[in-house]
Amino acid sequence: MLNLKQIEFCLDKIGDMFPHAECELVHSNPFELVVAVALSAQCTDALVNRVTKTLFQKYKRPEDYLAVPLEELQQDIKSIGLYRNKAKNIQKLSKMIIEDYGGEVPRDRDELVKLPGVGRKTANVVVSVAFGVPAIAVDTHVERVSKRLGICRWKDSVLEVEKTLMRKVPKEDWSVTHHRLIFFGRYHCKAQSPRCAECPLLSLCREGQKRDKKGLVKR
């Protein structure tokens, strides 16, 4: 496991690699972000952005999603995985935002997770990106990178990864660390083909060292 100084070194290096890392889901307000993140489960941001480009022209407010039959909304997002269930959740959360929150997306994470289809990860993304609240949202990239480097234990749950990162990373750096770990995992430390040979963290990375000993790191 990495110590705090090593973690700081790793995060600084990742910051050098991806200094402009930010949320890649296109949105213009908190409600659009909630919808986009809800759509992004088990789906790429690129595909979500292709769908929301037209979706957000047709549906601008929570009321708009309730003004059409469920089947119509399902057709509008059909190219996205799990579209039937996601459409149901979008209509349900739209109704709840109108009835319980006066048409405005709640700023509190504990309130956000009450919305259908909004889990802890989605809520953390929304409070961080839309409202500037320090948070670390653990997606597949953040989890993979944290475990490969040895910031977290292999057996840690997603919630344990989040809590470990919150302990080991200064609070003021939570949000930027979240985005940089995503970029590092998405574009460099990929699930199937991590770019270990050109990685500045290879000497510290337990997964990279293991791959190197097996002759899997081609220089």
UniProtKB/Swiss-Prot annotation:
SMART domains: ENDO3c (SM00478), FES (SM00525). [4Fe-4S] cluster binds at residues 189, 196, 199, 205. The gene is nth. This is Endonuclease III. Pfam families: EndIII_4Fe-2S, HHH, HhH-GPD. GO terms for molecular function: 4 iron, 4 sulfur cluster binding; class I DNA-(apurinic or apyrimidinic site) endonuclease activity; DNA binding; DNA N-glycosylase activity; metal ion binding. Disruption phenotype: Cells lacking this gene have a 5-fold increased spontaneous mutation frequency. A triple MutS/MutL/nth disruption has a 280-fold increased spontaneous mutation frequency. Residues 109-128 form the HhH domain. Binds 1 [4Fe-4S] cluster. DNA repair enzyme that has both DNA N-glycosylase activity and AP-lyase activity. The DNA N-glycosylase activity releases various damaged pyrimidines from DNA by cleaving the N-glycosidic bond, leaving an AP (apurinic/apyrimidinic) site. The AP-lyase activity cleaves the phosphodiester bond 3' to the AP site by a beta-elimination, leaving a 3'-terminal unsaturated sugar and a product with a terminal 5'-phosphate. Its cofactor is [4Fe-4S] cluster. Belongs to the Nth/MutY family. It catalyses: 2'-deoxyribonucleotide-(2'-deoxyribose 5'-phosphate)-2'-deoxyribonucleotide-DNA = a 3'-end 2'-deoxyribonucleotide-(2,3-dehydro-2,3-deoxyribose 5'-phosphate)-DNA + a 5'-end 5'-phospho-2'-deoxyribonucleoside-DNA + H(+). It is an enzyme of class 4 (lyase). Its EC number is 4.2.99.18. It comes from the Bacteria. PROSITE patterns: ENDONUCLEASE_III_1, ENDONUCLEASE_III_2. Keywords: 4Fe-4S, DNA damage, DNA repair, DNA-binding, Glycosidase, Hydrolase, Iron, Iron-sulfur, Lyase, Metal-binding. The keyword Cell division does not apply. GO terms for biological process: base-excision repair, AP site formation. InterPro entries: DNA_glycosylase, Endonuclease-III-like_CS2, Endonuclease3_FeS-loop_motif, Endouclease-III_FeS-bd_BS, HhH-GPD_domain, HhH_base_excis_C, HhH_motif, Nth. Coiled coil: none annotated.
